[in-house]
Amino acid sequence: MKRKETYLSRDFRETAALRFPAQAKELNTAFDMRLSALLAENAGASKEKQYHLKRQILPGIAAYEALQRVMPKEEALQIVHGYVERLARTSHKQLAALLHIPGLYRLVPGVFVKSTRSVFGPAAGFAPKELQTGNGVWRVDMMKCPYHDTCAEYGCPELCR
């Protein structure tokens, strides 16, 4: 069964093709093999945690490790961080455009809290500690994070810097 392409795998393949055309096939194979192994090792995770593992965490680890075959560790880290930052900028622009719709901005706090509790809740491996709710304020500390935990488990906690 073919995996759904994530933004990380797409960006990794683009980097391999543009910067390392002679090694692109080898890099893509290394990425695919590592990602398959990581997915197999984490197959028992909850459905909620799988959402994060498949879309972001494990492709990030596989890309980071594969890039280290052709560049220094710090450069590979910056490349993978660049992928994430580019997605964040794009998402920010999309949200900012939506918030120009009259009245929509009033709905955002409630929707944000509800979706964050759902997607980043205990079932997904997070341990949120809500510090303040109400009066238009929601403060939360994440006491446990599967992004950090998984990256640390695989020897690359720096991916969460």
Please provide the spans of the model-predicted regions.
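N-terminal leader/assembly segments
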Residues: 1-90
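A structural signal for well-ordered alpha-helical scaffolds and beta->alpha junctions
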Residues: 60, 160-161
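Amphipathic interaction/junction segments at domain boundaries or subunit interfaces
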Residues: 66-154, 159
